[in-house]
């Protein structure tokens, strides 16, 4: 994809700004991230099964589940890398809100209703009621993964203000701002876990209107780091941080009963200290390694998969329930091979379904 140029005479028609070149590294990151999200929700069934805790198959599930713990922050960073672009606000905040929030509106309304009254009630057999649904909406967790809709809407609402502050400050201002916000977020979480462990319950929780707050730092970091390209020993060093950090999260979770102090000082959370560092590291590694990569003939496939990623995030839980209705694929809480197979099937079906739905007028607004 190359920037478009104006071919008309300069004297009679003003030159149009060049269309932004597609950032294939972000496309790849988006695809990997949503595959990781599916893994977290598929393998989490076995990770939470006390009957297999500590077994080899349980550790296998932990490696996959916790090995992808960085993908949700990276999803937010990808959004920041694209949404905080100044051209998004060329026509003012009102135009931005109209385009972005109206685009999310149908999905924002449809999917909570679908998951509560179809997936939970019909597919999972848990009878839902309007009171429980409304409480879930206020809490921002009408279904397991749908907090992300509130998260994204909150960041979109704040985006024009953040972009205005960043506009004339260059990458340095963006990096400092992102670092400060992330540091405050991490410190808030750690102080809460320390105080709670000391007997003063300060557990953190977010409602629908605050789901986005802990992720502002990642949103800013995506913009600050989107053009960061490391080479040589710097790239090797950051890659080592990403790998070692991911491994440490896996080990810490698997041995948490024996390492209680680590859980207090380094809580495993999407905005915990180690996970935050790991997410930043993987983002920079991907941007650096894939900076000049071109998919060639695979460009169409990469584009379709990337554009379908948000829809996959929305539909995959329904697909998980559907796949598990097959008796041979039901035991994802104690059979690692079946769990891997279910993961692959859910990814393939979800991407295919969303790619098809995106071609249907009106329905495409939901995915």
Where are these regions (language model features)?
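Membrane-cytosol interface segments of multi-pass membrane proteins
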Residues: 1-185, 330-367
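Functional transmembrane helices that form membrane-embedded active or gating regions
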Residues: 22-34, 102-105, 233-246, 289-321, ...
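Aromatic-anchored segments of alpha-helical transmembrane domains
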Residues: 35-42, 113, 180-194, 241-256, ...
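Specific transmembrane alpha-helix
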Residues: 72-84, 150-163, 190-231, 272-293, ...
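Membrane-interfacial entry segments at the cytosolic side of transmembrane helices
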Residues: 169-178, 230-240
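Juxtamembrane "helix-exit" motif on the non-cytosolic side of transmembrane helices
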Residues: 190-199, 250-262, 324-330
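Alpha-helical transmembrane segments and terminal signal-anchor/GPI-anchor hydrophobic tails
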Residues: 231-299
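C-terminal transmembrane-bundle signature of multipass membrane proteins
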Residues: 278-288, 314-324, 347-359
């Amino acid at each position: 994809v190359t920037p478009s140029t104006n071919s008309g005479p300069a004297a009679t028609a003003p030159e149009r700004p060049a269309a932004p070149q597609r950032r294939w590294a972000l496309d790849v990151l988006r695809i990997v991230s949503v595959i990781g999200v599916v893994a977290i929700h598929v393998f989490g069934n076995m990770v939470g099964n006390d009957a297999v805790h500590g077994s080899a198959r349980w550790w296998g599930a932990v490696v996959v589940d916790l090995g992808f713990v960085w993908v949700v922050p990276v999803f937010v960073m990808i959004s920041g890398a694209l949404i905080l672009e100044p051209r998004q606000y060329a026509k003012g905040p009102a135009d931005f809100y109209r385009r972005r929030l109206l685009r999310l509106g149908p999905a924002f309304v449809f999917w909570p209703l679908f998951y509560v009254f179809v997936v939970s009630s019909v597919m999972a057999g848990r009878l839902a009621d309007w009171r429980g649904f409304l409480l879930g909406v206020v809490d921002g967790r009408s279904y397991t993964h749908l907090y992300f809709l509130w998260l994204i809407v909150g960041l979109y609402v704040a985006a024009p203000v953040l972009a205005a502050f960043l506009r004339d400050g260059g990458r340095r201002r963006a990096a400092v701002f992102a670092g400060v916000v992330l540091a405050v977020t991490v410190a808030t979480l750690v102080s809460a876990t320390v105080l709670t462990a000391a007997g003063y319950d300060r557990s953190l929780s977010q409602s629908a209107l605050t789901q986005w707050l802990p992720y502002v730092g990642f949103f800013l970091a995506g913009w600050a780091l989107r053009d960061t390209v490391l080479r040589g020993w710097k790239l090797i060093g950051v890659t080592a941080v990403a790998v070692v950090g991911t491994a440490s999260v896996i080990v810490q979770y698997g041995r948490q009963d024996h390492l209680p102090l680590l859980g207090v000082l380094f809580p495993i959370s999407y905005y915990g200290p180690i996970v935050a560092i790991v997410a930043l590291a993987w983002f920079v590694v991907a941007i650096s390694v894939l900076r000049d990569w071109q998919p060639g003939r695979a460009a169409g496939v990469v584009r379709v998969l990337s554009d379908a990623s948000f829809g996959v995030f929305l539909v995959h839980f329904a697909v998980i329930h559907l796949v598990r209705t097959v008796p041979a694929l039901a035991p994802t809480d104690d059979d690692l091979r079946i769990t891997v197979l279910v993961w692959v099937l859910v990814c393939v079906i979800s991407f295919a379904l969303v790619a098809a739905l995106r071609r249907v007028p009106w329905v495409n607004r939901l995915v």
